């Protein structure tokens, strides 16, 4: 340090300012070179594209298609940049969108309806028609709703979960009160899987991807699916009960961006449905699994690709909301259900 000081003191006073200015100029030039260098990540960032921020569960099923969308640059090809905020749980994802730290998130139909009734409407862009499954041991005699009477039933979530509500509605039509005629316990899906394996319950009402894991492991089967329950209630079995939600006012102001996002989603879903090799890259996001479990998850995801949201399906979504307890006089209007332009 003393040696450096002596050198500085030896410089003519009139040259000190020149050296200082020269150093600043060289620093700016060096920074500019870094920015345009082909090895710098920012140089590959498309300039001027609008950014769409979405919160998604790190190990959630929506992350599969959004990661593929980014990997294939379908966002950039459609004129925007997708920015994912990975979160650990559903409350964190909902908080991200309600607080405005992201533009959108994945939510189910009932959440979107509850926000509408609370005075904060969200635009609902269909994501998946997968609701869940009723899973039993392979050798079980349970094959219908009526067979559940007197049985021990594990239910994912709480009493207001869509699967349980639909199941009880169908049972009521058959003169069965499952809350009275069966032994019901509510728990998290992983705990229900373990309870089924330990023979602590006879059947579980669970989310589709937990059902897929069980069936992929072998020894378990679907007694009947949620699609069967929807049919029994005279509803279309292919209803998008999960969607990407965006604050309605913001979505109206950015209608073009929403349209680009929806178009890139359709492209991602089509690629994942049409080419199984795309899924190999996604395996780390799908958890440790055998080949059979992996295939069950892949096939289940593809099977949940929503059909076009026709007038009838939008009407059925509203009827589904009424069945699950929503106020029939305060339903989400059809304008909050996104529909791709022709």
Report the location of each language-model feature.
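N-terminal secretory signal peptides that target proteins for export/translocation
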Residues: 1-20
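Conserved C-terminal helix/tail region of periplasmic/extracytoplasmic solute-binding proteins
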Residues: 318-342
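Pocket-lining segment of extracytoplasmic ligand-binding domains
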Residues: 109-110, 185, 190-281
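Short, solvent-exposed loop/beta-turn-alpha elements that line the ligand-binding surface or hinge
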Residues: 77, 228-237, 302-311
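Bacterial N-terminal signal peptides
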Residues: 25-37
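Bacterial Sec-dependent signal peptides at the C-terminal "C-region" and cleavage site
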Residues: 35-46
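Short, glycine-/small- and polar/acidic-enriched structural segments
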Residues: 44-177, 185-186, 202-208, 223
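Secondary-structure end/capping motifs
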Residues: 251-326
């Amino acid at each position: 340090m003393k040696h450096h000081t002596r050198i500085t003191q030896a410089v003519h006073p009139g040259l000190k300012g020149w050296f200082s200015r020269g150093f600043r100029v060289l620093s700016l030039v060096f920074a500019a070179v870094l920015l345009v260098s082909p090895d710098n990540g920012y140089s590959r960032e498309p300039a001027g594209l609008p950014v769409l921020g979405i919160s998604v569960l790190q190990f959630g099923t929506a992350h599969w298609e959004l990661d593929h969308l980014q990997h294939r640059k379908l966002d950039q090809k459609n004129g925007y940049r997708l920015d994912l905020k990975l979160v650990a749980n559903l409350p964190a994802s909902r908080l991200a969108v309600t607080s405005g730290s992201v533009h959108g998130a994945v939510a189910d139909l009932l959440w979107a309806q509850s926000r509408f009734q609370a005075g904060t409407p969200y635009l609902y862009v269909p994501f998946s028609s997968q609701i869940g499954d009723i899973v039993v041991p392979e050798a079980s005699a349970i094959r219908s709703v009526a067979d559940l009477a007197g049985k021990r039933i594990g239910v994912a979530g709480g009493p207001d979960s869509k699967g349980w509500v639909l199941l009880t509605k169908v049972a009521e039509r058959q003169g069965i009160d499952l809350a009275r005629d069966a032994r019901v316990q509510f728990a998290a899906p992983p705990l229900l899987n373990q309870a089924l394996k330990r023979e602590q319950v006879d059947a579980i009402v669970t989310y589709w991807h937990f059902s897929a894991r069980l069936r992929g492991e072998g020894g378990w089967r679907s007694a009947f699916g949620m699609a069967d329950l929807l049919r029994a209630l005279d509803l279309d079995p292919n209803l998008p009960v999960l969607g990407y939600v965006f604050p309605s006012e913001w979505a109206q102001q950015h209608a073009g961006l929403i349209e680009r996002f929806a178009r890139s989603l359709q492209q991602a879903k089509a690629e994942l449905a049409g080419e199984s090799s795309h899924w190999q890259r996604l395996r780390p996001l799908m958890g440790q699994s055998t080949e059979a479990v992996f295939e069950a998850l892949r096939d289940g995801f593809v099977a949940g690709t929503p059909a076009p949201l026709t007038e009838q399906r939008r009407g059925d979504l509203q009827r589904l909301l009424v069945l699950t307890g929503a106020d029939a006089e305060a339903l989400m209007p059809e304008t909050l259900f996104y529909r791709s332009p022709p």
